């Protein structure tokens, strides 16, 4: 995760000339200025006349607040605020929900400071080996320890490629595992070998709905089927493309499992991880897996798994890292259709993208020609039915959506990607409403999710990144306040050359929500440096 680090600027006093009315402004940080504009005005943007022409700018909120100006920390000397509609000097405050694309600065200068390595999805979670290292060991016929999420089974499995199984490997697995040796296989291979599920999925009462088939032993080359050599023989037979249904006795001592198509991207289980690793290693899609037990026979947890792996020179990888690895490389969406759509902000071209994994349809609103794909203004917006459609005042989602479209229209070129399935930061509409009830009872948005046993933010941006790339974007100015989104998109190889903040108006209804996002989730709703505090979040709008 990237760190939040705001560099400091020395304040300087400058003057805004506005039709015989001079107002003072303090230069703050990278195009943000504290400014006093005494009255109200319906505009959300205005222009500043300079010696070199006219540039767009915006005032955030109301009196004594923030003005955003494209020239970074350059003082606005001899500039005039111009009403864009009348070309006349502006005599009133200009209220905006954010800044224009021209107001962006290089991303590190805007507070999202992270080492380049922080964006590399191939880097393992601290304390784990990398996925490429595990893939190489699988390719060589070695065992790997695969660990799932602590909120799932929180267990580790010994995993290897089935086609490389040996009696020695089986003896090691049986000695350190539960003794229940499983072989994960794709549906086509199970059907070819006539291996039906033990119970249909509707009747499956196993905690994680693991899809067990009938058990088997190889008919040829085995005795009782239980020895390490017999089990290796059975596993090699299951992995063989030449095997036939009549080559197996039923029941037996090996437990075939049905792999979920899509692998760990559809189900974050050891069954799927074992096949995914063998496929990534260039081997046949059949994996061996067995749960590791502690010395007392209980399931081994992560500290013991690390100790065990170190003693036996085994790599330990997490399914979460495997998911990230695959999302970076697999094709996740396909373009379905496109049409021109006139909007309240102006004409856009809408592109529908369909998820290959789950069929969810997403939309990209494109303004102008992407051309060489350089320096494109981009907003990746997560679906929020209550805010975007019904205008809920609990959040600032609808305001950010409208502001993003407005800014893209004003810029004349840009992309807004609307990701569905992100409702409530990924928890879904029903859970979001339950969380609202807890918030009404005193919890904040983070505490409410945690009390419901749900992740604070489970959104993933691989689909958005692939849509952006498919549209031809190569470098972008990202409209966001969220460092997780910045890192999430950067991790998919997209070059982010600037960040454009989206600073929403504060209301009584959303103040606590925005404050929580700022203090607990790192959102950039306030700027603090060298004793001079600019905290929009602390000045509650009375409107």
From Swiss-Prot:
Its main location: plastid. Disruption phenotype: No visible phenotype when heterozygous. Bleached phenotype and no viable seeds produced when homozygous. D-ribulose 5-phosphate binds at residues 152-153, 157, 267-271, 291. The keyword Transport does not apply. The record marks 253, 291 as: Essential for DHBP synthase activity. GO terms for cellular component: chloroplast; chloroplast stroma. Gene3D superfamilies: DHBP synthase, GTP cyclohydrolase II. Residues 1-56 form a transit peptide. Mg(2+) 1 binds at residue 153. The active site is at residues 457, 459. One of its GO terms (molecular function) is 3,4-dihydroxy-2-butanone-4-phosphate synthase activity. The keyword Cell wall biogenesis/degradation does not apply. Expressed in leaves, shoots, roots, flowers and siliques. GTP binds at residues 379-383, 400, 423-425, 445, 480, 485. Mg(2+) 2 binds at residues 153, 270. Binds 2 divalent metal cations per subunit. Magnesium or manganese. Its EC number is 4.1.99.12, 3.5.4.25. Involved in riboflavin biosynthesis. Catalyzes both the conversion of D-ribulose 5-phosphate to formate and 3,4-dihydroxy-2-butanone 4-phosphate and the conversion of GTP to 2,5-diamino-6-ribosylamino-4(3H)-pyrimidinone 5'-phosphate (DARP), formate and pyrophosphate. RIBA2 and RIBA3 together are not able to complement the loss of function of RIBA1. HAMAP family: RibA, RibB, RibBA. This is Bifunctional riboflavin biosynthesis protein RIBA 1, chloroplastic. It comes from Arabidopsis thaliana (Mouse-ear cress).
